[in-house]
Design a protein with these regions (language model features):
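Hydrophobic transmembrane alpha-helices
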Residues: 2-6, 10-16, 20-73
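Hydrophobic alpha-helical transmembrane segments
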Residues: 14-15, 40-45, 69, 84-88, ...
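Lipid-exposed faces of alpha-helical membrane segments in multi-pass integral membrane proteins
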Residues: 15-22, 45, 49-52, 89, ...
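Conserved active-site and cofactor/substrate-binding residues in soluble primary-metabolism enzymes
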Residues: 39-43, 47, 68-69, 115, ...
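Alpha-helical membrane-inserting segments
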Residues: 53, 57, 93, 97, ...
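Alpha-helical membrane segments and adjacent membrane-interface helices in multi-pass membrane proteins
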Residues: 54-117
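Short helix-perturbing small/polar motifs within transmembrane alpha-helices
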Residues: 113-158
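Glycine-rich ThDP/TPP pyrophosphate-binding loop and its adjacent helix/strand module
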Residues: 139-144, 163, 168-176
Length: 176
């Protein structure tokens, strides 16, 4: 789901890069209340786990592959702000060391996967917890619902970005 370099024009990538920087700054500020000396190692381990599971790709269709996102899991484990930071670190490492995504698209990917996907999963998770029966399985079920919902929501953000500044030849209706 990483957007590669050259798929979205530079003005659009720059605008969403600025939004990603702003969102990351908010996450940094808010993470101070979510993470302390006791929970900081969990945030780091969560980032490592997300990185590891994202290295496992599975075929989707016609020469493409997918992998787990991890934002919803991180959100449940360490809170939304720390999760956003963990996913941002993972995306940065993947872009810099593995060319997964790309540097000019890093802001787009951070916006979609670290901010939109995590925020969406947080809102869906909180809503699901409120409406599900209060049982042992409510939290894992709410987390699964949140993870499931976060993927099309972040994909919709990409579709909006593609509609604004897509360089590809595919029409937006095909992308969405």
């Amino acid at each position: 789901m990483h957007i590669p370099d050259g798929f979205i024009d530079i003005p659009t990538a720059s605008a969403f890069g600025l939004l990603a920087v702003a969102g990351t700054a908010v996450a940094l500020k808010r993470a101070k209340s979510e993470v302390d000396d006791r929970t900081a190692p969990m945030a780091g381990l969560t980032a490592v786990f997300i990185f590891a599971v994202q290295m496992l790709n599975f075929p989707v269709a016609a020469g493409t592959s997918g992998h787990l996102l991890g934002g919803a899991l991180a959100m449940v484990l360490v809170g939304p702000s720390a999760a956003s930071l963990a996913v941002t670190v993972v995306l940065g490492v993947q872009a810099l060391l593995f060319a997964d995504g790309g540097l000019t698209a890093l802001g787009l990917n951070v916006f979609n996967l670290s901010i939109i996907a995590v925020l969406a999963s947080f809102l869906v998770f909180k809503g699901a917890v409120k409406i599900l029966p209060k049982t042992k399985s409510a939290i894992p079920l709410a987390a699964g619902i949140a993870a499931f919902a976060s993927v099309p929501i972040s994909a919709t953000a990409f579709t909006l970005q593609y509609a604004i500044g897509g360089i590809g030849t595919a029409p937006v209706s095909t992308v969405f």
